[in-house]
Regions:
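Catalytic domains of lipid- and phosphate-ester/thioester hydrolases
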Residues: 1-933
């Protein structure tokens, strides 16, 4: 029976070293020892143990169905030489994972393990229903039967539309609520203005708001004072960052309340009470101006003296010790407060002035709060200058960062108001019949013409730079188009929210539930009613819609399972270990012939639970073949490690023993999704191939992320954090709002209880990283990635990250003769590298690359014929997932041919069959000999 998942999940996650040690025992049937013969405890010691054990790895790269086809041919070539079963590890990514998962499931189900699978792959005899025959039938794995009226095609469309609409039940209310937030502020300001007709009551509301704003400012300054006082003793930045967020919240609240107060005050015409109050003030302050619109700013400046003087008095600095210096800082703070308060008052009074040029309330509420924050930032600048003789570089950096935060808040508020207030009218203008249609086509035509001219007229410095220069221009054009599309989407949602407000206002008018309004056609009650309805929809949808199952992942995974895992289903002998029959699971069905549903052609038993593939489930049984490692990427788009701001991802692996990441720890494969029966091989394969994803490691960008998430172009998967036992057991988040918002905004990180995992190529696309982490002595990498320009980006990326993270150097050990068709007959299909673990241990890496040389010997004619039809072969776009029979066979045959070409003509002495390498090491040695010819 499998281990109790609850008991397993109650312990902390295993470290990377503990997990690798368990793997070593499962693969080598021995205890890992370090260089001194002691039990290996660290990752470095475990690499020594693996190296001394002669560990080997086969790595199959990402690249979708293109990579799967090519890797299948290479694997067949290895099988014909008896090498497949000799690998200890099978490390796969994305498309390589299709074939890797097929092999893992096949070896698990086959009684003879890898030996039986090798024999089947090596055979050139073709039988109806065998693995290769099944793969050919389902080579268009997403929609096997092509055609416009194909049920497979329309099933994809129907599934996408269904999932898109269900996800829209979350993001539509969410964006609409964000668009309504500025309207709520505006309607409250407008409603108070309309509900208080008398100047006295309106002015009283304004004074009350000003007092509340001043209180908020005092709270912010008090927290700032405490932060300054504690700052020298803080060991980390976390408390300071948290305090600064509280200060920002206080300032934002003060900005909104003071903006409203100034607006109300501008509408309160001078009366006897106000004139008497100002007269009394002028007796005390004879320089106070007579103009009533000039008096509030000066009074506000006087009010700001007190808190800023307190800030100056509370200011702490190693250079500020003498009493006179502290008094000077207090005076400087008071002066800065007066200037800041007066500036805020002047700006807001000018914006809200009721003269002929008075702004609409929407424009006023867009500009006034940022003006308040800008004035506060100005005060910070002036104060920093006033106390510059007593401040340190640390202080000045702190003030600069505070100013930057205020700037970000200003931009964010202005952007939200621009979408909420002005997006709908602009959209009305664009789509109106009289103005919109010509405007639309003019914009499209101009954008297309400009983009085409830029692409044509770009004049690079040299011809080799031309494609890259054009690519950069195209990327800029795409970014600009994406930004425009994003604004249109947000404005469209705001337009819908505004129409809902209009309808609600009409309904409340009919029912007699009206609330006073001055400028706007609806009231704050209407906004709250619509907001409450949207919030209910958001909460209900967040609880009911599964963020994992209603992405595109399920559709993608089910079709991969049918094609690659279903291909290995046949009647196999019952294995010699106790079968897992825990409901709803039935391991016995894995060894029965496939029995798909007649209508959808899916069989739920095609997909084995990942933990079932663990080696050594019965004592005395032979190892079932290479230990599978399915590589994925843990997305860290908003991660905390500043050194990883380019990569934005970390390694995440699925194996039959453990699931997790070296930076977070690992949980047993039996623990993950234990509440749903356990994580499956099909899920791991699909996550590893989740190339289309809003958060995609180094490929992530804010606009791309937002639009892909809105369009539900989401193949990734949310998994529980290894450190959170409760969530590890669950298959999916219980509330979908936070995960979807994290995908929309690119806020995925390593700290939240739910982690977003996607295509392994978003971190490292060859599978080499984890093979080197395990200290393998001989590694064969099959690279079928899309690389038409032969930049070898994936190889360079892997070597760089391995050197940075693991301290292992990979250096070229022979000639480099891999290239394009221009090499004709002089090209090679592989290159050799040294994997330098330390001064005493150096392994070998054989890098096999998909390439075509038209004049090379013995290239299959059908491969050359297809290469003549496709100029980019064998580097056709990964986006082409609907392969034809000729495409599939051309890539498969090329992989098989390359493996033959690498070892052809070299014979090893003292072998029963001198053309058959006795080990992976000998195979690499043969390849090295061939490269020197």
């Amino acid at each position: 029976m499998p281990p109790d998942p609850r008991a397993a999940a109650s312990v902390p996650p295993a470290s990377a070293a503990e997990t690798l040690a368990a793997e070593f025992r499962a693969v080598h049937r021995a205890e890992p020892l370090d260089a001194h013969g002691q039990p290996a405890k660290s990752e470095a010691d475990l690499r020594v143990a693996q190296f001394e054990a002669g560990a080997t790895a086969l790595c199959l790269s990402g690249g979708g169905i293109r990579s799967a086809s090519f890797c299948l041919g290479v694997v067949q070539g290895l099988a014909r030489r008896g090498l497949l079963a000799r690998f200890d590890y099978l490390s796969t990514v994305s498309g390589g994972g299709y074939i890797g998962s097929l092999l893992a499931a096949w070896m698990y189900r086959a009684g003879g393990g890898a030996i039986e699978v090798e024999a089947a792959l090596a055979s050139r005899e073709r039988r109806e229903g065998d693995v290769l025959d099944t793969l050919r039938r389902y080579v268009r794995y997403l929609a096997p039967r092509q055609g416009f009226f194909s049920v497979d095609t329309w099933t994809l469309v129907a599934t996408y539309v269904r999932n898109l609409l269900l996800n829209a039940l979350i993001w539509l209310p969410l964006i609409a609520l964000a668009a309504l937030a500025p309207w709520l502020v505006a309607t409250i300001v407008d409603g108070v203005n309309a509900a208080l007709p008398g100047a006295d009551t309106l002015r009283l509301a304004a004074l009350g708001g000003s007092a509340a704003s001043l209180a908020g400012l005092l709270v912010g300054i008090f927290m700032l004072r405490n932060a300054i006082a504690r700052r020298p003793t803080q060991a980390t930045g976390a408390p300071g960052a948290r305090t600064h967020r509280h200060i920002q919240q206080a300032l934002c609240g003060s900005a909104l309340v003071l903006s409203a107060s100034t607006y109300w005050l501008a509408f309160a015409e001078p009366d006897a009470f106000w004139q008497q109050l100002i007269g009394t003030a002028r007796h005390v302050l004879p320089w106070l101006p007579v103009d009533p619109h000039a008096q509030p700013p000066l009074l506000l400046g006087l009010l700001f003296i007190v808190p800023h003087a307190y800030l100056g008095l509370a200011y702490r600095s190693p250079l500020l010790t003498a009493l006179r210096h502290r008094v000077a800082a207090m005076v400087a703070g008071g002066v800065v407060g007066f200037i800041t308060g007066t500036a805020i008052g002047w700006i807001m009074t000018a914006l809200a002035h009721t003269g002929a040029w008075a702004l609409p309330i929407e424009a006023y509420m867009t500009l006034a709060p940022p003006a308040f924050l800008a004035a506060v930032a100005l005060g910070e600048i002036l104060f920093a200058g006033a106390v510059s003789r007593f401040s340190t570089d640390f202080d000045r950096e702190w003030w600069a960062r505070a100013g930057a935060s205020s700037t970000i808040l200003c931009i964010a508020w202005a952007g939200a108001c621009a979408v909420g207030y002005f997006g709908p009218p602009l959209l009305d203008l664009v789509v109106s019949w009289r103005a919109g249609v010509p405007t639309y086509w003019i914009v499209v035509a101009l954008a297309g013409a400009i983009a085409r001219l830029l692409l044509r007229q770009e004049r690079p410095l040299d011809r080799d730079a031309q494609p890259r220069a054009r690519l950069r221009v195209a990327e800029r054009a795409i970014d600009a188009a994406g930004a425009l599309a994003l604004f249109a989407i947000l404005a469209g949602v705001a337009w819908l929210a505004l129409r809902m407000l209009d309808a609600t206002a009409y309904a409340t008018t009919l029912l007699g539930w009206t609330v006073a309004a001055e400028e706007l056609p609806f009231s704050w009650l209407d906004v709250l009613a619509v907001g409450a309805a949207l919030a209910v929809v958001l909460v209900v949808a967040g609880l009911c819609v599964d963020v994992n199952r209603f992405s595109l992942h399920g559709m993608y995974r089910d079709r991969l399972i049918r094609t690659f895992l279903g291909a290995s289903r046949a009647r196999h002998p019952t294995p010699p270990w106790p079968l897992d029959e825990t409901p709803p699971l039935s391991e016995a069905a894995q060894f029965a012939p496939r029995n798909p549903d007649d209508f959808i052609q899916f069989d739920r038993d095609d997909n084995p639970v990942l933990r079932w593939l663990a080696p050594g489930r019965a004592s005395g049984t032979p190892r079932k073949g290479p230990f599978p490692i399915v590589n994925a990427a843990l997305n860290l788009v908003a991660g905390r490690n500043l050194a990883w701001q380019e990569r934005k991802a970390a390694s995440f692996t699925f194996t039959p023993l453990a699931v997790g990441s070296p930076i977070l720890g690992y949980r047993g494969a039996a623990d993950y999704a234990a509440g749903a029966g356990g994580i499956t091989l099909g899920t791991a394969m699909a996550v590893s191939g989740a190339a289309v994803s809003p958060n995609a490691g180094a490929n992530s960008s804010p606009i791309r992320t937002f639009i892909l998430a809105l369009c539900n172009a989401r193949l990734g998967w949310w998994l529980g954090h290894p450190a959170d036992p409760a969530r590890v057991r669950r298959a999916t988040p219980g509330f979908a709002v936070y995960p979807l918002v994290s995908e929309l905004l690119g806020r995925t990180d390593e700290t939240h209880p739910w982690l977003f995992v996607s295509d392994g190529g978003h971190f490292e696309n060859l599978g080499l990283y984890e093979a080197v982490r395990r200290g393998c002595r001989d590694i064969v990498v099959v690279d079928a990635s899309c690389d038409p320009d032969r930049n070898y980006d994936d190889l360079g990326n892997a070597i760089r990250k391995i050197r940075i993270d693991l301290g292992v150097r990979i250096e070229r050990a022979g000639p480099w003769r891999i290239g394009g068709r221009e090499l004709r007959a002089n090209g090679r299909y592989c290159a050799l590298f040294d994997v330098i673990y330390d001064d005493e241990r150096s392994g070998s890496l054989l890098y096999v690359k998909a390439a075509v040389y038209p004049d090379a010997d013995n290239v299959p004619i059908d491969v050359l014929q297809y290469a003549g039809r496709s100029e980019t072969f064998p580097h056709e776009s990964t986006g082409r997932q609907f392969f034809t029979e000729s495409q599939f066979e051309s890539y498969r045959a090329l992989g098989e041919f390359e493996l033959d070409a690498i070892v052809e003509g070299v014979e090893m002495a003292n072998r029963p069959d001198p053309t058959m390498p006795a080990s992976v090491a000998e195979f690499v040695e043969i390849a090295a000999i061939r490269m020197t010819e």
